[in-house]
Structures are given as structure tokens and as C-alpha cells.
């Protein structure tokens, strides 16, 4: 005969949930953990992929990734005809300029700040069969010296062109050629131009840009700055003396 508990015992034991309700509650908890994990993983993936693209935009002067058109690549290759020596693409993006140059026989290097694009470029070079002559490196263009390159390609933006113009003029040899795409340099006069609109390409030969003055060097620039500073100091002293004489 089944024993029936007293009212006091039933109150202490509390309500007894059916087995089906306990199972549903456990399933809901499992689904909650699963959804949280999926959402968290997705957000982490988006962050990891997007950060290399967003970070350059936070810099004072950024070089955004805009893929070169097939016509732009064709125009760059045209400007490289009868040229020799190593080539560098400043801000190489997905590597199409470097790969095209390597196919033309140039030892080509691309510098890019976005690691995803660098890895993708290396894969594309391997697929194209030019991974031996097309190299890609993760680096900020302002931290790289370009003195060893005879051919320089840049897809720039207006804000960076004046500063880059000065950097290249200091570092490149007289025989080097700079090929600018989308935007020309502000002070240099192009020796060759091809294409129209967004596909326009400007070529600058360093020997022509410098004229008969030859290649400037860091020592000359330093002396020039010192001379300018000394001149300003002398002018300031002379002005001060005149003011004292008046008094």
C-alpha cells in the first residue's frame, strides 16, 4: 500500500516538475549557449577581417585599397617598355601590378600594410607561376627606403602625393622612373602620359625632374636647413639691434 505524505512533507518537498518540462528547459539552455557561441565567433571573425582594412583609414595619410582596372594595369606595363631593373609597387593591394610586372620579366616587390592582401597577393603570384620573382611584404610605405628600385609604381591619393614626392626625390637614383596612377604629383612635370580619366598614368624620369642639379642628398638638405636657420637667426638679431638703436 502506497504511503501518502503528510501536508507538511509535501510543502517541504515543493512542486515536482514533469520530466518533459525538465528536458525542454535543458534544450533551451543548450541552444542559448550555441547561439551565443556562434554570434561571438562571427563578431570575432568580422573584427579580424575588417581591422586591417579599417586601421589605415585612422592614419593621418592613408592609402585605401581600390583594385586597379585592367586598363590601368595595361597602361602601367606600357610605361615599363624598354625599362629594366627592379620594380616596387607602393601599396600593392591585391598584387596585380607586381604580378603583371613579374610576367614582363621584372623582379618585382610590393609593400602593403594590410596582411590579408599580402597573403592573397602571394597566393595569386603562386597561381600565376611568378612567385619566384614577385615578392610581397607587410610594411608601412613611410618606413621603407626605395633607393634600390629603378621603377616605382604608386596608386596614390592627393593628400599623400606632396610628401611622397619629396621622399622619392631624396631616395631614388637619377635613372629611376616613377609611374603614378589616378593622381599626378603636384610639382613634377610628367615625361610621358597615357590613358584617359581614371585610367590615366603619368611617368616621371628622375633625371629630368632634377634637371642639371643632380640627386639631392640628406647632407645637402641638412646644410640647407642649417643655412636657413642661421639666416633667420641673423635676421632676427639685426631686427633686434635696429629696435634698440631706435630706443
Curated annotation (Swiss-Prot):
Region feature Required for mitochondrial location, mapped onto this chain: 51-85
Q: List the catalytic activities from the record.
A: L-lysyl-[protein] + 3 S-adenosyl-L-methionine = N(6),N(6),N(6)-trimethyl-L-lysyl-[protein] + 3 S-adenosyl-L-homocysteine + 3 H(+)
Q: What class of enzyme is it?
A: transferase
Q: Tell me the GO BP annotations in alphabetical order.
A: peptidyl-lysine methylation; peptidyl-lysine trimethylation; positive regulation of proton-transporting ATP synthase activity, rotational mechanism; positive regulation of sensory perception of pain; regulation of mitochondrial ATP synthesis coupled proton transport
- Membrane spanning segments where? 34-54
What topology does the record note for this protein and the membrane?
Single-pass membrane protein
State any GO CC term. mitochondrion
Q: Where is the composition biased (Basic and acidic residues)?
A: 1-12
Q: Which PANTHER family does this one have?
A: ATP SYNTHASE SUBUNIT C LYSINE N-METHYLTRANSFERASE, METHYLTRANSFERASE DOMAIN-CONTAINING PROTEIN
* Family the UniProt entry places it in: Belongs to the ANT/ATPSC lysine N-methyltransferase family.
**Function summary:** Mitochondrial protein-lysine N-methyltransferase that trimethylates ATP synthase subunit C, ATP5MC1 and ATP5MC2. Trimethylation is required for proper incorporation of the C subunit into the ATP synthase complex and mitochondrial respiration. Promotes chronic pain. Involved in persistent inflammatory and neuropathic pain: methyltransferase activity in the mitochondria of sensory neurons promotes chronic pain via a pathway that depends on the production of reactive oxygen species (ROS) and on the engagement of spinal cord microglia.
- Which protein is depicted? ATP synthase subunit C lysine N-methyltransferase
Q: Which organism is it from?
A: Mus musculus
Native organism taxonomy: Eukaryota, Metazoa, Chordata, Craniata, Vertebrata
